């Protein structure tokens, strides 16, 4: 009796192959985009190591602290906002906003270093504002993922899927630290003899380009519900 009840409590979901393919095209780019948000979040740490005295520990603490404060506060605003506008628009806003903020940080850094006036430039102030803006848009990521996937996965499917998706998201740490470090080394090979500060802009520009690329990927593929992608909506068991 108990076995029968347990079986009945978790219905078998006979998703078609077409549905599973379309669902993959929904969640996989979503996971990649979120990983790229990590790349455009912790790149500040990699840049700090390259900038040396242009970004002291005190500067970094203030800049990162401003971003962390905004990130925490933004959840209070963006959680209800994503509930209203949907996870698709939330993730698009996050990717676009973070791309613009990272591009601005990279462009500003390139400008002040190449001008030869980096030591007198208000780098701490400008980066505090731009990084806080970046972190505001970064806060759209997690809530948007939860909102979107809730409509595509039955509660009985989410356990196994969360492990796969969690691994994808963890790859963002690899992108943030390992790949950004490799980008710095590659830039120094492209411009031999260039000091670290003169190529640090790369770790902001490349994540910006990648986020912009995946903004358009998500614009094309990401949908809030199966019903918006040519498949029937279903009871997810929530």
Regions found by a protein language model. Name each.
Residues 25-55:
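Extracytoplasmic
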Residues 65-80:
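Central cavity-lining transmembrane alpha-helices of secondary-active solute carriers
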Residues 222-238:
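Flexible cytoplasmic inter-helical loops of multi-pass small-molecule transporters
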Residues 101, 116-140:
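Hydrophobic core of transmembrane alpha-helices in multi-pass small-molecule transporters
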Residues 96-120:
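C-terminal ends and interior cores of transmembrane alpha-helices
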Residues 165-222:
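Helix-loop-helix hairpin linking two adjacent transmembrane segments in secondary transporters
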Residues 130-167:
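Cytoplasmic helix-loop-helix junction between adjacent transmembrane helices
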């Amino acid at each position: 009796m108990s076995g029968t009840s347990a079986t009945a409590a978790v219905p078998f979901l006979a998703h078609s192959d077409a549905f599973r393919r379309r669902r993959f095209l929904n969640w996989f780019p979503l996971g990649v985009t979120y990983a790229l948000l990590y790349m455009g979040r912790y790149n500040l740490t990699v840049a700090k190591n390259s900038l040396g005295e242009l970004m002291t520990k005190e500067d970094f603490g203030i800049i990162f602290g401003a971003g962390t404060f905004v990130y925490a506060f933004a959840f209070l605003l963006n959680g209800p906002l994503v509930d209203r506008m949907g996870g698709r628009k939330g993730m698009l806003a996050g990717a676009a906003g973070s791309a613009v903020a990272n591009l601005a940080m990279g462009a500003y850094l390139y400008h002040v270093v190449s001008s030869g006036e980096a030591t007198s430039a208000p780098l701490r102030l400008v980066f505090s504002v731009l990084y806080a803006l970046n972190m505001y848009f970064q806060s759209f990521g997690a809530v948007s993922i939860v909102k979107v996937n809730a409509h595509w996965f039955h509660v009985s499917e989410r356990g196994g899927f969360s492990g796969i998706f969690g691994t994808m998201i963890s790859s963002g740490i690899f992108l943030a630290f390992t790949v950004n470090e490799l980008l710095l080394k590659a830039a120094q090979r492209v411009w031999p003899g260039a000091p670290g500060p003169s190529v640090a802009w790369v770790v902001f520009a490349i994540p910006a380009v990648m986020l912009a690329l995946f903004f358009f990927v998500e614009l094309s593929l990401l949908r809030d519900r199966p019903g918006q992608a040519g498949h029937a909506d279903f009871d997810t068991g929530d």
